[in-house]
Amino acid sequence: KNNAQKYNAKTIVFFTEPHAAEYFSKVRDKNQIPPPRICPWREKFQLLKKSKIDFACFLKFNSKLRTMSPDDFISQILDSINLVSFTVGDDFRFGAGRKGDTDLLKNWGEKKGILVENTETITLDGQRVSSTRIREELLNNNFNNAEKLLGRPYTFSGKIVHGQHLGRTINIPTANIWLPNQRLPIKGVYAVKCKLNDLSLNGIANMGVRPTVGGEKPVLEVHLFEFNENIYSQRIRVKFVEKIRDEKKFDNLDMLKSQ
């Protein structure tokens, strides 16, 4: 953004979609589970909008992009945009085999009159800030540490969809939230704070497969305290406050209710 102001230019951020690890898990080894996303693309878009980024460009990660050489990536993608500066992460790699690096970009930039910069490694408490580290903090219920690494509280927002309606049979209705990639970087039962339109609501959430009812696919469901309205198809934002316990399998729904 500083360079955009300096050159009186617009800002654009590039992403690949899906994540490379998700792509390779489907085409190479379907048994290899990719790491869960910390921030889905819709969430990224909203954060960029809040940061007043002008444009977001999502590059489809497919066989064509995967096999594209670094030189072709530059000529077919970067050269198609009227760039005046280009900033990448400290460990940025691109092109087939991850052969493209910052040095190649800087050589290209010098020829084109484009400023190419790489960000310095960001550390906290002497350790590099990375997605792996953030996932570990979230999984270990260290939400304060995760917030420091993210620069914001960890939240997830999604559309409320129909489930099996089993919660209503024990007078504990839940809002089932659609998961775009089946998993979140957390699992278990959590105390949560939710934002639904203009309402701020407290509740309890379960992120897991629901073993008591024979579930297999991961599901995020939230029970909102003192709230029982039809909110299907609406979007809800969930802030995870504290982990209460791991997910457990109970003999029946009545035993689950007593918990």
Go through each PLM region and give its residues.
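Phosphate/ribose-recognition catalytic cores of enzymes acting on nucleotide-derived substrates
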Residues: A4, H162-Q259
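Residue-level signal for inorganic ion chemistry
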Residues: L48, F86, A146, V192, ...
